Amino acid sequence: MKYLCLLLCFLSFEFSSAQAQCKTVPVSKAWAGNSVNAVVFRKNSLVTYKNVQFIAFYNQKGKLTLGKRKLNASKWEIVETAFNGNIHDAHNCISIMVDGDGFLHVSWDHHGNPLNYAHSVAPLSLQLTDKLPMTGLNETNATYPEFYKMPNGNLIFLYRDGRSGKGNLVMNRYDVKSKAWTQLHTNLIDGEGRQNAYWQACVDKKGTFNISWVWRGSPDVASNHDMLFARSTDGGISWEKSTGEKYTLPINEANAELACSIPRNSELINQTSMTTDDSGNPFIASYWRSANSTVPQYHIVYNVDNKWKELDLGFRTTPFSLSGVGTKRIPISRPQVLVSGKGDKASIRLFFRDSERNDKVSVAVCNNIAQNQWKVSDLTNFGVGSWEPTYDTELWKDKKSLHLFVENVQQVDGEGVAEAQPEMVNVLEVK
């Protein structure tokens, strides 16, 4: 099935105003009663190794389901695994990644649960091992599993140890040569027993691991505040600020680099996205409400020449509040950001979903951030409910080809579940 979409196309990695086609490739029908299959913090939902693309989702029975295809093919091989997930909790998503030898790694079903992890029995296989420990350390209370692939084929794995408002960031590393995990940090970012970091991260083309986060002091989303930053140039062992100043670990509220000051009760969302420009400068996408406004807007926080800057995109008109606990039904998605070019002349694409645009897959494009002029277009002519954008990071890094995971899902406020029929999971191939 194909849908016509509007997109500001990529040409030689620069944006230009043009129309293009998006090809929507159906995969399989899946659970859609909440947003567990379509939350922004799935790292990853889609991933490509050489010419094989993998996908993961929960089916209507709550089974961890895997799929693969050859790139540009329309037929998927789908396998329902023996593993289950609590599909009634939108936190309990699936994350996948493929290591440098082609083994698929999977982690799923966490919201203060013992770590669930397995990997494929052979390269490019959809058959998984039994459930395995990673390191056996700090694996009893895990949330938000995320994989990141390093240029040498090794993997980094992040998760929260603890609960909302009182948790620590754990970092593990997988070595493809030894095929073993080691724990690099039990407490990379220390909440000091009174708050925790809600992070987003990325790896640039040189292998620098960038991480940014907001602090939260309670389960109430309204307690989110500030945007902080750290990076590692040695595979996650040592950490520094954007200036090169070394961190004394663990990072905490007192020594963390402040990228942007954002007060509590600003409708600041947690767990969004970040990327880097062609020079490795970090770009962080989020949304919050400025002090003189009632309307939360998308913002870009970025660093150029050792100076932090912030852009208010300003195109939204509808107010809303994030106060409360649990996964909420929110009129906009958390954003996904991609950048080309360098510094103040970089071009940005921000992918999102907004009820103001009938909940379609949309993109805001700025060709020159020094001018801060944005053009907003819809990529689909169909709505996607409470979907949030995730994409195939490795395909983008390797081939600058953009594939989005898309499913029309519903989310009831306060961790509720909708009476929804299964919906088709699609890969939206942006040409």
What are these regions (language model features)?
Residues Q21-K431:
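Extracellular, repeat-based ectodomains that mediate carbohydrate processing or recognition
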